[in-house]
A protein has these predicted regions:
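GST-like fold's C-terminal all-alpha helical module
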Residues: 1-66, 71
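Acidic/histidine-enriched, glycine/proline-rich intrinsically disordered or flexible terminal extensions
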Residues: 77-117
Length: 118
């Protein structure tokens, strides 16, 4: 019940942002911005736990899942170790609903682009 109330509140906040900003695209206030970065982890939780949200909220979640920067952020998080105990939850997880991971491999010659890219 409390999670449902929180989700309905999020839907109201996101709809209000769209009404005020009248964006032309998937993000809350036009171009991807700080508000969208703030809600990216929320979108990941909604998707990861298979929570039910309104169609417009689901479209916003799916925009995050398909965003290349979000996908890189998630991939980096997955390769940097175990979940910390304080963040581990006992909830059932669903298969990741976002796009499939892109095939990747470490470079064979040359210098890596940065410390994160092998």
């Amino acid at each position: 019940p409390e999670v449902e109330a929180d989700l309905r509140r999020l839907e109201l906040i996101w709809e209000h942002a769209r009404e005020v900003c009248a964006p032309n695209g998937p993000w809350l206030c036009g171009e991807y911005g700080i508000v969208d970065a703030f809600y990216a982890p929320v979108a990941a939780r909604i998707a990861g736990y298979g929570l039910s949200v309104s169609p417009s909220a689901q479209a916003y979640v799916e925009a995050h899942l398909a965003d290349p920067a979000f996908r890189r952020w998630r991939a980096m998080g997955l390769v940097h170790g175990e979940t910390l105990n304080r963040y581990a939850m006992t909830y059932d997880l669903t298969d990741w609903p976002g796009p499939s991971a892109l095939p990747a491999r470490a470079i064979e010659t040359g210098t890596p682009e940065n410390a994160t890219c092998p």
